[in-house]
């Protein structure tokens, strides 16, 4: 099942008990965050606040608050099925020629999907049913959430920022938070390595002093939203990838003020420009780390046009100490990463980004170890293979007999298979998340790798312990007589 717009997905969630409408007036200032946070921690439904205090537009929150809803957005019921998305991405990143006739036949579905890649341009798009421009633009009329008591101002959180660089054929979609600065101004908080910032940098070099056109889409269809947070190949547009996932071309329309294309069924579109040199201090804001971050200067986005659907819905979220919505997205997207990593490193059994680690700051990887030093090779590969793991501070490598998603198993492996000096890798002066105030320098810090695998000859001179495992035949005999023993519940093994 694919969803043409956000509204059809909302209807689907509601029909399946995954969305709750809240008619009681709720204030976007702090109250929505408190309600959404309580519901998310209880693994509850998405929320549609129908009567935001002081505003006329309803607010959608916790849309991707469980891995199940992320899977549902892609027409799947089980988050594990998201590995199909990872298989597709692995194919796109490194397509291989067929190894024979059968292999060629097996790849036909992927090549057919590729036909859905180019976006489809439409006219009379729903996102442009209502248009205001110039002096009529007033962003304070939107129900923009003020999430935490220490936040400096309301914050746009789920906007898809659309940019294009002079050297790129594709348009880039990225999600960057945007501080409300005035009736027609937002602060565009994009870090230097992100796609939008790189496009802007290239534009300034080729067109010095010129205004840079930018568009922000709020409330796009769920597949396009997820396409913007998925690690697509650098040369591919998120629109093209969304078309692949959906099985239908992404519908776009030309923006009102520039040549950028916007998701045609979006709820709200903000169009405008960045004036080179116009900067403003951004923050502080409560972030996904669970702390308020430092302030810094970022470009100012001047909004010249606001268009939206009739009876538009404002899509929002909050970030805070995990679990939050980004952490739940991370749990779901974890399954996307597994096939991508396995294609490059077939020895990887499983890969886990614990949500407690702010979605990406720690990774645990289980491998089929094949030679001394193998764990260290996988560490280095994981740090360098995907840009998404550039900020991963800690990597733990375990053997295939350890469930890398079970801390009981992982801690057992660390405490029985590791020597802190021999099996710890420390690397200084590496890229680190700008928001990580624990690093000695903003954006630059260290990484730690932990080899919690069994040690081979060459890694130790000691006789290595053999794990205790019950005889399989005995286990089967006990399984057969368990009900006769009068013990209420058999433990899950």
Swiss-Prot record:
Entry keyword set: Cell membrane, Decarboxylase, Flavoprotein, FMN, Lyase, Manganese, Membrane, Metal-binding, Ubiquinone biosynthesis
Location(s) in or outside the cell: Cell membrane
Gene3D superfamilies associated with the record: Single helix bin, UbiD C-terminal domain-like
Lineage: superkingdom: Bacteria
Keyword rRNA processing assigned: no
CC per GO annotation: cytosol; plasma membrane
One annotated GO biological process: ubiquinone biosynthetic process
Catalyzed reactions per annotation: a 4-hydroxy-3-(all-trans-polyprenyl)benzoate + H(+) = a 2-(all-trans-polyprenyl)phenol + CO2
HAMAP family in alphabetical order: UbiD
Name by which UniProt lists this protein: 3-octaprenyl-4-hydroxybenzoate carboxy-lyase
Source species taxonomy: Bacteria, Pseudomonadati, Pseudomonadota, Gammaproteobacteria, Alteromonadales
Gene that specifies this protein: ubiD
